[in-house]
Amino acid sequence: MSFRTNSCQQLSLTDSFGGLTSREQKALERSWAKVFAEDIFPAINEEPFRVLYSSDASRPNTPVNVCVGALIIKEIFGISDDEVIENLMLDPRYQYALHTTSFDEQPLSDKTLTRFRKRCYDYEAIYGIDLLHECITGLGTNIAKLMDINPRIKRMDSMMIAANIRKLSRIELLYTCVAKFVIYLHKNKCDDLIKGMEHYCDPNDYNKTFYYCNNSSTVNQLDTILKDADSLLRSCGADYDDITEYQLLVRCLSEQTIVEETFRRLRTKEDGGFHSAMLQNPSDPDATYRSKGGKEHQGYAANLEETVGKNGSVITDYQFEQNNYSDSQFLKDNLERTEFQNEESTMITDGAYSGKENHDLAAEKNIRLINTDLSGKPIDDILADFVFNEIGTKVVRCPAGYEPKSCGYTGSKSQQFHVSFQRDQCANCPNKDRCKAKIHKRVSSVTVSVKSHERAKQQRFMGTEEFRNLFKIRNGVETLPSLLRRQYHADRMPVRGLIRGRFFFGCKIGALNFKKLFTYRKGLGHYAQNPVLA
């Protein structure tokens, strides 16, 4: 199948739109389809998807912009692939939105969207490039321009995404991995390797093992499962190294158990080796574990960057990773993707994105990073009044205005300064307790770091009117996780795995951005005004 761009961007003389009555045409142009057809569909860039298709002359592909547009519409209304395809054949609004009113036959069949997604999954698995991400973020940037949103103010937040899996106990996890591999061997006519384990193939065996027995038999069940697992490892050897079920069994045993003198037992806390990336459920090997805000999460995490203006807000960047990915690393990745800003812009985040390294990386891109909260304990405000040289390698003056007698620098790793003053200068200074000055026999000494100096400056900034206005802007991004969960069912995606979850999440971001644009076009938005956005 070869790649061909979709040139059908205008109505033809035989277009089905002309067969509608004037009343029907007016109703169509007042609907969501008008905004989608004029502002979203033409902005879908098909060119990056060229790599998914053959360069040889062959049957042309289904238009990429129709596929991407249909996937976004699917998330807007929360419907299935089949419903999208049926509606495209029967509903003029869908045809108008996707510019297919002039087609003799609608271009989507029952497998079109599935095959398109599969091509994107395979390409990302091989090359590590998410083609949909570039498309959705490009649409977000275009929507921001249509809504007249200045890109100089942005805010950021992260959210947990639940994986589509059951929470398993350790013994259930071991049983499931053994059962899946036994079932694989049975289906592939390898019954000689599973003698005595045929009960794993019984659909009711799971319930018999865990629900129809008393607690006293749990130890015996665990021993039996571990012995069966060892038996499978001995009989299969290296012949099944490429089989997913075998790989998951080996992974589970290496993470959950330990072998002592040829005897396998469960790993304990004293043995160590527990980590958040351990297998949670063989149905989704990519899902990880994280405890956040007193709650346990299994699955993934998403980071959202929202551009804010007087006419509303639009998500202009997002990232989808395993949930043990830190907020600080999300910010670093975002800054790495961001080009240098000709005009200084502001990024407003919470305390999880704070840190001098992040502030320095943002400054390199001409971005002012504002944290509405700071992690760790507060420090004395007096540290903000120490004056450093231009390159930040020497203390020039203390808060009382004294020049130091000497200044020792520990280097770029700890960035601490050991500063000496005349003994009387600190001994008689009213700030000596706040600076934690040490009075020696001949001199006085103070230890101050660049990090503490920057933190004190941030704490001082938090008391200003400008910060309070920025804080109000930051609060708005907290609505995104709620919207994505309630309206777009981000915690109930019908797929498993990091790559598939990332693709579906991108479609949901596209749907949410369209809703924001449609609200703006219809004049239905109510946007709180802020002096920072003026």
Residue ranges of each PLM-predicted region?
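Basic, low-complexity segments
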Residues: 1-56
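Double-stranded DNA-binding cores of transcription factors and transposases
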Residues: 3, 64-65
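Helix-boundary capping/turn motifs
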Residues: 39-44, 59-64, 87-89
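Short helix-loop boundary/capping segments at the starts of domains
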Residues: 46, 50, 54, 76-79, ...
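A short glycine/serine-rich beta->alpha loop
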Residues: 52-60, 495-497
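Alpha-helical support elements that line or immediately flank enzyme active sites
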Residues: 68-78
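Anion-binding and metal-coordination hotspots
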Residues: 80-83, 88, 102, 106, ...
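Short, basic interhelical loop/turn and adjoining N-cap
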Residues: 92-109
